[in-house]
Design a protein with these regions (language model features):
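Terminal transmembrane helical anchor/hairpin motif
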Residues: 42-58, 169, 174, 179-265
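Short, charged juxtamembrane terminal tails flanking transmembrane helices
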Residues: 2-4, 262-270
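Aromatic- and glycine-rich beta-strand/loop motifs that create alpha-glucan
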Residues: 1-29
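Cytoplasmic juxtamembrane interface segments
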Residues: 2-13, 83-85, 89, 160-193
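Short helix-to-coil transition segments within interhelical loops
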Residues: 94-101
Length: 270
C-alpha cells in the first residue's frame, strides 16, 4: 500500500508538472475562461437593454451549466488517456515490469486529473461569481461560491474515477465512450423522473447537493415545487456525499483490477 501511495504521489507530481507546458496551459485557460466570457457577454447585453428582472437567478443557472460542461470536458482530456498515453509513449513495458507500478500510475493520473479539473472549475466559478456580483448584483455571492465549490469538488472526484475506469476499458476510444457516457447516463438517465435508476447517476446526487447548499437558482421560484413533484425529495445530504464516494471507490477499484489483470498490446500488429 505504501508503495502504491508513494508511486501515485510521484506520478501525480510529474503529471502536474507536464500540465504547465504552453499547450496544456492554453487549453486549461481556454476552458476556465469560457464560462465567465459567456456570462459577461450575456450580462452586458442585459445591462444595455435595462432588463435585469429575473436575470440574477438565470446568471447562476447559466454559470452552473457552463462550468459543469467545462468540468466534464477537462475530465475527458485529462482522465481518459491514462493508459493510452503510456502505450503511445512506449513506457508501458517498463511500468508493467515494476511491482505496483500499474496501480501507482492509475492512482497518480486519477489524482492529477482531479486536481487539474477542480482548479479549472474553481477558477471559472470564481470569475463567474465576480462578474455576476459586479454586473448583476446577485444575492449571497459568497454563499453561492462556497456551495458550488463543494459541488464541483465532489463532481471532479466522482467523474475522475469514472473516466479513469473508462480509460482502462476502452484504450483508443476512451474519449468517445466518455462522451457517450455523459450523454447516456448524465443527461438521459439522470433526467428520468422519480425512478430508482436516476439515483445511480452522479448528476442526481450533485444536483441535490447544489439545490440544498446553494438554494434554488432557477429563474422561476415556483419551479422548486414542480421539481420535487417530479424527482422526489431526495436523500439526506450525508447519504448523497457517501454515495458519491462509493461511486468513486467502486470505479477506481474496478479500474485497478482491470489494469492489473489485463494484458495491453504495446506494439501494432503488422
Amino acid at each position: 500500500m505504501k508503495l502504491w501511495l508513494n508511486g501515485a504521489i510521484a506520478t501525480c507530481r510529474f503529471e502536474l508538472q507536464r500540465s504547465f507546458t504552453f499547450q496544456r496551459t492554453s487549453v486549461s485557460l481556454m476552458l476556465a475562461l469560457f464560462p465567465p466570457t459567456m456570462l459577461f457577454l450575456l450580462s452586458l447585453g442585459t445591462r444595455v437593454s435595462g432588463d435585469l428582472t429575473g436575470f440574477q437567478d438565470f446568471a447562476k443557472l447559466i454559470s452552473v451549466l457552463l462550468i459543469s460542461l467545462v468540468c466534464l470536458l477537462s475530465q475527458l482530456l485529462w482522465a481518459t488517456p491514462n493508459v493510452y498515453s503510456e502505450l503511445e509513449g512506449k513506457s508501458w513495458g517498463f511500468i508493467a515490469s515494476r511491482p505496483g507500478a500499474r496501480i501507482s500510475i492509475l492512482l497518480g493520473k486519477f489524482l492529477a486529473s482531479f486536481v487539474v479539473s477542480f482548479a479549472i472549475s474553481l477558477l471559472a466559478l470564481s470569475l463567474c461569481v465576480i462578474i455576476a456580483d459586479r454586473m448583476l448584483g446577485i444575492l449571497n455571492p459568497e454563499k453561492f461560491w462556497i456551495a458550488m465549490s463543494g459541488v464541483y469538488l465532489f463532481a471532479c472526484l466522482a467523474y475522475s474515477a469514472i473516466f479513469s475506469l473508462i480509460g482502462t476499458l476502452f484504450i483508443k476510444r476512451a474519449m468517445v465512450v466518455g462522451a457517450g457516457y455523459i450523454i447516456g447516463s448524465e443527461m438521459v438517465l439522470a433526467s428520468i423522473p422519480d425512478v430508482l435508476i436516476n439515483q445511480f447517476t452522479v448528476r442526481f446526487h450533485l444536483q441535490e447537493l447544489g439545490i440544498r447548499w446553494a438554494g434554488w437558482f432557477f429563474p422561476s421560484p415556483s419551479s422548486l415545487k414542480d421539481y420535487r413533484l417530479v424527482f422526489g425529495e431526495g436523500l439526506p445530504i450525508a447519504l448523497h456525499i457517501g454515495l458519491l464516494f462509493l461511486i468513486a471507490a467502486v470505479a477506481l477499484g474496478l479500474a485497478g483490477w482491470i489494469i492489473v489483470s489485463r494484458e495491453f498490446i504495446t506494439t501494432e500488429e503488422s
